[in-house]
Curated annotation (Swiss-Prot):
Role noted for this protein: Non-catalytic component of the proteasome, a multicatalytic proteinase complex which is characterized by its ability to cleave peptides with Arg, Phe, Tyr, Leu, and Glu adjacent to the leaving group at neutral or slightly basic pH. The proteasome has an ATP-dependent proteolytic activity.
Nucleus as UniProt keyword: yes
Cellular compartment(s): Cytoplasm; Nucleus
InterPro entries: Ntn_hydrolases_N, Proteasome_beta4, Proteasome_bsu_CS, Proteasome_sua/b, Proteasome_suB-type
Record's protein name: Probable proteasome subunit beta type-7
Principal cellular location given in the protein's record: cytoplasm
GO BP annotations, alphabetical order: proteasome-mediated ubiquitin-dependent protein catabolic process
Organism: Schizosaccharomyces pombe (strain 972 / ATCC 24843)
Keyword annotations of the record: Cytoplasm, Nucleus, Proteasome
């Protein structure tokens, strides 16, 4: 076999090896259309918790291209209406499409002019139906979403989750991505057994900061630059370009770090 024959497939899509260009399988239009079967540019953790006066939600600004930390200024929290924030982990392009859907929903609701405003529970139900419908088409939006806000006439704190399969639930503390393993125990420690009802805004922020610090230390898909949104009956306070202090002296004692003599 010549060198040219060996290198013929270099640089070609893998499907050409099994289904040569022009084959019956490749040109078939009966197969389902799938776009985001394997996400390329992704965001990792989003975390949210209730406190006495409202809800706090945070997400870092990193979008990773595979395992490469590629984009450092991606906002993964979106304001919807007057008292709702939607945070997204997973595929960034799918998240951008969800943002467009939410913008259309806001415009449509505003056109009614009936005095009613979008509530967090309405938005969560809408997103859960959208995600479940796309899952049934075998072309899901590859995201995990957290909807946070103050809901209803009494402005009750509201935090709920929805993912690409249409799975939904609500809890005092929720996280996505690697934060489900690293940060959620700390969030639950602050909120379980109705402790969130006496949790101050300052304590909630301290918990969020500690979670973001742990994620920065331990999650390779995280960044020490994040946004925090606080939703209370008075409105939304959106803080960007936040960071936490970090100390790496402990790394010298970790096996495999730097030049060590074993």
């Amino acid at each position: 076999m010549s060198f040219l024959e060996l290198t013929e497939v270099w640089g070609k899509p893998q499907k050409d090896i099994f289904f040569p260009s022009g084959s019956e399988v490749e040109e078939s239009t009966d197969a389902p259309i799938q776009r985001t079967v394997q996400p390329i540019v992704t965001g990792s953790s989003v975390l949210a918790l209730k406190f006495a006066d409202g809800v706090m939600i945070a997400a870092d600004n990193l979008a990773s291209y595979g395992s490469l930390a590629r984009f450092y200024d991606v906002e993964r929290l979106t304001k919807v209406g007057d008292n709702t924030i939607v945070g997204a982990g997973g595929d960034i392009s799918d998240y951008q499409q969800i943002q467009r859907l939410l913008e259309k929903l806001e415009i449509k609701e505003g056109n009614y002019g009936d005095g009613y405003a979008l509530q967090p529970s309405y938005i969560h139900e809408y997103l859960s139906k959208v995600l479940y419908a796309r899952r049934n088409k075998l072309d899901p939006y590859w995201n995990q979403l957290i909807v946070a806000g103050v809901d209803g006439e009494n402005k009750e704190p509201y935090v709920a989750f929805a993912d690409l399969r249409g799975t939904t639930y609500s809890a005092p503390a929720i996280a996505t991505g690697f934060a489900m393993h690293l940060a959620l125990p700390m969030l639950r420690k602050a909120t379980d057994d109705d402790r969130w009802k006496t949790l101050s805004k300052e304590s909630a922020r301290a918990t969020i900061d500690e979670c973001m610090r742990v994620l920065f230390y331990r999650d390779a898909r995280s960044l020490n630059k994040f946004s925090v949104a606080t939703i209370t009956p008075e409105g939304i306070e959106f803080q960007t370009d936040q960071s936490v202090s970090s100390k790496w002296a402990f790394a010298e004692k970790q096996y495999g770090y730097g030049t060590q003599t074993v």
